[in-house]
């Protein structure tokens, strides 16, 4: 199906490319005219273009002249002239496409064209990069063009405070990473004051390395979270010790391909003996299963220096795709704690989600979206289906002459590594620069050790050397350079033969104390001379390296994605330079072992000798077949994630829209009055027990329950007399009107006490407090629902349809709860005892959970595990030697006789096959988030009546759920 879509998408490429060529011709036709303009005349172009837009001209109409202007300014500031293919790429981006341009074709410079053009509308343009360094570097370097033309340039980086971030967003053009843009969106939707908002909309975004951000990280939700209640760190440490006593394949199964584990009967017996319990699968021991599965996963599936590194007593996740450390991020659902326990470092507290959105849904909010990458065509169908983005391959400025050799396959990793070192030694001896791409930190360090033994000088670039990334890559093309890099580390900085001229010139000026931001005039004055000086130094070496064959890229193993292999290869052969690439494989590599067992069997059958490789197109083809299978699987996972997140996205859009309206001062007084009426009517309907006759209603229960929300002064006997002769809807309406009239009178008295302005402000604050709390509870309950919804398929029901249906019901229940709690809070503030509105607000906010201390995070990675950026905080250490049996006894004593011995995870079904138990989502005792988990029902209770269990919820939102 995907292949058919790909073919259909390519059918229109010729027509699109013709349009792009026409744009380049139109720009070239203006070059002489624009080149003749003085600096002042060029600067006057910006106000002229803005006036033309105001007068009704479209961006398409002014595009040729605007592009020609940017090209001329680039020549004068950077010494770089846009090639025709770069003009074509700029037009493709302006029209909302992905421009596929090979490495070294100057994508960063291409982005200046549509960025300037779209910034003329005054609505802001976001340029999205993969890390803070690139955002800062590009905003400085390319910012010279924009600043020359009178545009403001901002840059969002991690450490900035809200006032500074707001200033950066208010600039005409803002650079930043995908995470920073996404988190600021979430923070804006948690703000309590309009003045705290930082973003100003989502008009146009250009995403650099778009495949990395919109494909590789698409399954990663951005999450803002805070610490959950309770300290269960002892359990993680106990289970970390316990699993060391268990044996793989004897006590538990591991499926490395699917990244799941399963406990076997002998293992269950050992666990029960160790913990001193009779049955691991009793409801009281539900949470133990989660600790056990996470401990096994931490032991078998998450490897140090591959999936994570340990630095200064902290477990830091390594991005599988880039090899970069992800500072502050944490795996969710207790997995990170299990890894911390395994490594013997401090086990930090679990977190509770406050706000979340996937990158897919965040970027789909933009009015116009575009992207750049060197490798998008393999994912063209997904880009179109998910983001409505077409992929336009832009031809290279000069023909590609890189030689891509067939793969070499060896029996073992040891043989493969020996061959790699031999090949590198040969290349290094003649001075040819070599880039070795590895799949993990561990692999890079193994290769580095072998190169040290062979006395081959080299640089290592992996997650542990993140800070020097750009500097290492900038000189990786120099004569004799040998660079070992994990996957795509260093992506975003060109490897130029002889050295990266622009980077070296910028570094030299900064070392002398000149910066394009701090000392722009001096920097601009010295730039041409410094650039020419570096060019002269690099020129001879560039030619020498070309004669040696250019950059040799050596892949130490294949990645699951063809795209990432192509990105590694793409580091060589830029701008028509010579180059060569080859991948070395072994039958022990993960891709071969897990996804291509048939090819492995065929190779083994040939009886390979030690150290003897197989080099054949059939091997390369077999590897690509395995990669296609993995890519297809990952695409289906991303599609599935998006389908489920679309349910939440619709709800989130409505909630955030309403919240923004309240935050920005919309008068909600009429809404409050409607909340009062709706709440009263809901309670009346809950008390009538389905009877139309008022004499059959539970009047005592009605007024008792109603007084917990609105302390009504209406006399029960008087009401019964008035409605005695009425039935059905008329009776309900009459009772409602009497109680609502009394409530409004009380509310009016409240307004007289604190004034109209004071009450409006109080209403706004109360609604925000309640909405935030209920939305967090809703996220919590939707997570529960999603965790167990897959099991509905066993009952011949579509899990997605079930999730949509129940999610909608839960959303409606949340809306009712927001109305009810808002009314309850407003009527239970003792206004007479509160001197000012601020004090009243403080009283309200004390009733809601505080979200001042938050953690920022990113969720399920490619393995389906969630990652979370946790806030810093002190975690009280438990005694490492605490015995597990004693811990269970203590927990039982604390919870009371006959109650669960552990904080039970809640009503979500447990998938033993996947080992997924959301233990981090334990209900808070005072909130009783899942009181209906005991399975009880109370027949005869009205669905809107208070639940007899005493939780304070309506029956339908509590134990009434057990009747479904």
From Swiss-Prot:
ATP binds at residues 86, 104-108, 494. It catalyses: ATP + H2O + cellular proteinSide 1 = ADP + phosphate + cellular proteinSide 2. Its EC number is 7.4.2.8. Its cofactor is Zn(2+). One of its GO terms (cellular component) is cell envelope Sec protein transport complex. Residues 889-900 have a biased composition (Low complexity). This is Protein translocase subunit SecA. It comes from Bifidobacterium longum (strain DJO10A). The gene is secA.
């Amino acid at each position: 199906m995907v292949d058919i879509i790909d073919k259909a998408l390519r059918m229109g490429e010729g027509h699109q490319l013709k349009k792009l060529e026409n744009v380049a011709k139109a720009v070239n036709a203006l070059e002489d005219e624009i080149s003749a303009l003085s600096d002042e005349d060029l600067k006057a172009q910006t106000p002229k273009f803005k006036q033309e837009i105001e007068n009704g001209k479209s961006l398409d109409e002014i595009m040729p002249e605007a592009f020609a202007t940017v090209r001329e300014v680039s020549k004068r500031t950077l010494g770089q002239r846009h090639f025709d293919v770069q003009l074509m790429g700029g037009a493709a981006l302006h029209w909302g496409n992905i421009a596929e341009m090979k490495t070294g074709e100057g994508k960063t410079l291409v982005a200046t064209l549509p960025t300037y053009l779209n910034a003329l509308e005054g609505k802001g343009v976001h340029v999205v990069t993969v890390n803070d360094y690139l955002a800062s570097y590009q905003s400085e370097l390319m910012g010279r063009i924009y600043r020359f033309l009178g545009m403001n340039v901002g840059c969002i980086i991690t450490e900035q405070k809200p006032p500074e971030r707001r200033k950066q967003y208010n600039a005409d053009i803002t650079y930043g990473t995908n995470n920073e843009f996404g988190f600021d969106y979430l923070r804006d939707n948690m703000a309590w004051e309009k003045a705290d908002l930082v973003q100003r909309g989502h008009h146009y975004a250009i995403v650099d390395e778009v495949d990395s951000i919109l494909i590789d990280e698409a399954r990663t939700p951005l999450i803002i979270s805070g610490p959950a209640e309770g300290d269960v760190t002892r359990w993680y440490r106990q289970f970390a010790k316990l699993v060391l006593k268990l044996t793989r394949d004897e006590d538990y199964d591991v499926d490395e391909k699917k990244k799941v584990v399963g406990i076997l009967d002998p293992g269950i017996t050992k666990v029960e003996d160790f913990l001193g319990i009779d049955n691991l699968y009793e409801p009281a021991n539900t949470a133990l299963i989660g600790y056990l599965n996470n401990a096994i996963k931490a032991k078998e599936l998450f490897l140090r220096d591959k999936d994570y590194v340990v630095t200064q007593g902290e477990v830091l996740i390594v991005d599988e795709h880039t090899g970069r450390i992800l500072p502050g991020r944490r795996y969710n659902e207790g997995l990170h704690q299990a890894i911390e326990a395994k490594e013997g470092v401090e086990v930090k507290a679990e977190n509770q989600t406050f706000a979340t959105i996937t990158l897919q849904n965040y970027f789909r909010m933009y009015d116009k979206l575009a992207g750049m990458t060197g490798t998008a065509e393999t994912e063209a169908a997904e880009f179109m289906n998910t983001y409505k983005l077409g992929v336009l391959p832009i031809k290279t400025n000069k023909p590609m002459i890189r030689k891509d050799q067939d793969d070499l396959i060896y029996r073992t990793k040891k043989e493969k590594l020996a061959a790699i070192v031999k090949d590198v030694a040969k290349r290094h001896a003649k001075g040819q620069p070599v880039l070795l791409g590895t799949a993990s930190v561990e692999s890079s360090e193994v290769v580095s050790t072998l190169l040290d033994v062979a006395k081959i000088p080299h640089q290592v670039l992996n997650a542990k050397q993140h800070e020097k990334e750009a500097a290492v890559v900038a000189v990786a093309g120099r004569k004799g350079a040998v660079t070992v890099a994990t996957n795509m580390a260093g992506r975003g900085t060109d490897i130029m033969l002889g050295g990266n001229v622009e980077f070296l010139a910028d570094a030299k000026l900064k070392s002398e104390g000149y910066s394009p931001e701090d000392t722009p005039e001096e920097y601009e004055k010295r730039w041409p001379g410094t650039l020419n000086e570096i060019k002269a130094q690099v020129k001879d070496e560039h030619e020498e390296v070309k004669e040696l064959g250019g950059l040799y890229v050596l892949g130490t193993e294949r990645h699951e994605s063809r795209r990432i292999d192509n990105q590694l290869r793409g580091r060589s052969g830029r701008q028509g330079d010579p180059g060569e690439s080859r991948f070395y494989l072994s039958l022990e590599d993960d891709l071969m072992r897990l996804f291509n067992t048939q090819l492995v069997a065929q190779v083994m059958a040939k009886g390979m000798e030690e150290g003897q490789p197989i080099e054949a197109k059939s091997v390369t083809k077999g590897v690509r077949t395995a990669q296609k299978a993995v890519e297809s699987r990952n695409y289906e996972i991303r599609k599935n994630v998006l389908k489920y997140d679309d349910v939440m996205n619709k709800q989130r859009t409505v909630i955030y829209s309403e919240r923004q309206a309240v935050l920005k001062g919309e008068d909600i007084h009429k809404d409050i009055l409607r909340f009062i009426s709706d709440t009263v009517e809901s309670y009346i309907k809950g008390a009538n027990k389905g009877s139309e006759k008022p004499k059959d209603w539970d009047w005592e229960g009605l007024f008792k329950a109603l007084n917990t929300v609105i302390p009504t002064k209406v006399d029960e006997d008087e009401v019964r007399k008035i409605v005695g002769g009425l039935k059905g809807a008329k009776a309900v309406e009459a009772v409602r009107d009497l109680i609502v009239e009394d409530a409004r009178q009380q509310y009016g008295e409240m307004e007289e006490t604190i004034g109209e302005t004071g009450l409006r402000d109080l209403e706004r604050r109360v609604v925000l407090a309640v909405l935030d709390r209920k939305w967090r509870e809703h996220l919590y309950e939707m997570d529960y629902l999603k965790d167990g919804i897959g099991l509905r398929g066993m009952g011949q029901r579509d899990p997605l349809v079930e999730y949509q249906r129940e999610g909608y019901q839960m959303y409606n229940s949340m809306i009712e709860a927001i109305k009810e709690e808002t009314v309850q809070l407003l009527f239970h503030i003792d206004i007479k005892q509160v001197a000012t509105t601020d004090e009243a607000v403080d009283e309200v906010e004390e009733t809601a959970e505080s979200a001042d201390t938050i953690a920022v995070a990113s969720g399920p990675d490619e393995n389906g595990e969630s990652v979370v950026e946790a806030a810093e905080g002190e975690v009280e250490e438990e005694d490492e030697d605490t015995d597990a049996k004693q811990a269970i006894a203590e927990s039982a004593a604390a919870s009371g006789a006959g109650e669960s011995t552990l904080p039970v995870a809640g009503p979500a079904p447990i998938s033993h096959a996947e080992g997924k138990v959301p233990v981090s989502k334990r209900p808070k005792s005072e909130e009783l988030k899942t009181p209906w988990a005991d399975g009880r029902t109370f027949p005869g209770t009205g669905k809107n009546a208070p639940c007899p269990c005493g939780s304070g919820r309506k029956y339908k939102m509590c134990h009434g759920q057990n009747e479904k």
